[in-house]
């Protein structure tokens, strides 16, 4: 018998997370490492588990994630987005609660590009009066 698996892709800033949900006991594996080993802050792990809290499915699925690009925060939020999309594939009834929590919306905020003549995106060179 083929194993049931739900997939979701999450994105945030420059991070892309490919998430697979498999019925299990709630283990989260990120890039073949345990999530507590991969992410340095407990707050990021709590953030990542939000879709399970909203849908009350904590401990029902094992999560397998491949994530690349960006930093820890962007990656954690990309994983959260991917988990929400995979849960939606698992049961379309979750759409309302996930949507209300804002977990299905891709956060469009990106790093602003550096402009010519400036030191950074908005930081101008130091002004000298004399």
UniProtKB/Swiss-Prot annotation:
GO terms for molecular function: RNA binding; structural constituent of ribosome. It comes from the Bacteria. The keyword Ribosomal protein applies. The keyword Ribonucleoprotein applies. InterPro entries: Ribosomal_Su5_D2-typ_SF (IPR020568), Ribosomal_uS9 (IPR000754), Ribosomal_uS9_bac/plastid (IPR023035), Ribosomal_uS9_CS (IPR020574), Ribsml_uS5_D2-typ_fold_subgr (IPR014721). Residues 111-130 have a biased composition (Basic residues). Belongs to the universal ribosomal protein uS9 family. It comes from Staphylococcus aureus (strain MW2). One of its GO terms (cellular component) is cytosolic small ribosomal subunit. Keywords: Ribonucleoprotein, Ribosomal protein. This is Small ribosomal subunit protein uS9. The gene is rpsI. Residues 99-130 are annotated as: Disordered. PANTHER family: RIBOSOMAL PROTEIN S9, SMALL RIBOSOMAL SUBUNIT PROTEIN US9M. NCBIfam families: PRK00132.1 (NF001099). The lineage of its organism: Bacteria, Bacillati, Bacillota, Bacilli, Bacillales. One of its GO terms (biological process) is translation.
């Amino acid at each position: 018998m083929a194993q049931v698996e739900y997939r979701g892709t999450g994105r945030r800033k420059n991070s892309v997370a490919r998430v697979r949900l498999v019925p299990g006991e709630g283990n989260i594996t990120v890039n073949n490492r345990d999530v507590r080993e991969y992410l340095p802050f407990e707050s990021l792990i709590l953030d990542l588990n939000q879709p399970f809290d909203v849908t009350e499915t904590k401990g029902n699925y094992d999560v397998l994630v491949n994530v690349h690009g960006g930093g820890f925060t962007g990656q954690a939020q990309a994983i959260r987005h991917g988990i929400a999309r995979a849960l939606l594939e698992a049961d379309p009834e979750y759409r309302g609660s996930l949507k209300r929590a804002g977990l299905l919306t891709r956060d469009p905020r990106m790093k602003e590009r550096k402009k010519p003549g400036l030191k950074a995106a908005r930081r101008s060179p130091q002004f000298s009066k004399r």
